[in-house]
């Protein structure tokens, strides 16, 4: 046991050194965004650092484009080999925090059969929705009837939260986007 103690200490230091490394200036994770997921768990956006992410924005009461966005995210993930798939996290943040509370997100995830070990559906405060959408380059506006007019894109973030690729191809697979994911995951981290 005494021999293992230095090894544990070294591993702990390596892990904390990664967390202490400053974020790149163009990292989405620099935003002070607090997320609450479909299970009521809270985390900052920066806490997602360390693994590549497929990110999008949507809202649960959307009947047209948002289901296609979620299906496109699923289709993209399923096009990856199992080893690559295991290294990618999925994050969908709501444009509509007023209506998309935790219970609504959970119900949507269950209805769409989105495995919570793979999918994070999240909400944040309205001002943070605006900040996040701006940094991701997604535009939206609420219409008088309560619906939203919004961009429809999937975005690949690297492990440090930098935008590595994006696609606006919704409803069918974008092979170039899938290849960008494969290349990113294959890169050595360091």
Describe the residue ranges of each PLM region.
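N-terminal targeting signals for export/organelle localization
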Residues: 1-32, 36, 184-190
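Short loop/turn motifs at secondary-structure junctions and domain boundaries
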Residues: 23-27, 47, 145-148
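Short loop/turn microsegments at loop-to-beta-strand junctions
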Residues: 30-31, 52-53, 151-153
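A short beta-strand-turn-helix
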Residues: 33-53
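Short active-site neighborhood of thiol/selenol oxidoreductases, capturing the structured segment around
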Residues: 46-69, 73
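Structural microenvironment flanking redox-active thiols in thiol-disulfide oxidoreductases
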Residues: 70-132
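Structural micro-motif
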Residues: 119, 130, 134-143, 147-155
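Thiol-/selenol-based redox modules, centered on thioredoxin-like
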Residues: 143-190
């Amino acid at each position: 046991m005494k021999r293992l103690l230095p090894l544990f200490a070294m591993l702990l230091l390596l892990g904390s050194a990664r967390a202490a490394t400053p974020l790149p200036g163009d990292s989405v994770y620099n935003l002070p965004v607090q997320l609450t997921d479909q299970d009521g768990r809270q985390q900052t956006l920066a806490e997602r650092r360390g693994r590549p992410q497929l990110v999008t924005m949507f809202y649960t009461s959307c009947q047209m484009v948002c289901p296609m966005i979620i299906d496109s995210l699923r289709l993209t993930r399923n096009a990856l080999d199992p080893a690559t798939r295991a290294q990618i996290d999925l994050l969908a943040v709501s444009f509509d925090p007023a209506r998309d509370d935790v219970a609504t997100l959970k119900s949507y995830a269950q209805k769409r059969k989105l495995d919570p070990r793979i999918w994070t559906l999240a909400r944040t405060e309205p001002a943070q929705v605006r900040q996040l959408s701006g940094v991701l380059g997604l535009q939206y506006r609420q219409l008088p009837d309560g619906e939203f007019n919004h961009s429809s894109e999937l975005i690949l973030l690297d492990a440090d939260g930098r935008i590595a690729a994006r696609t606006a191809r919704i409803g069918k697979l974008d092979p170039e986007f899938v290849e960008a994911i494969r290349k990113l995951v294959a890169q050595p981290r360091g």
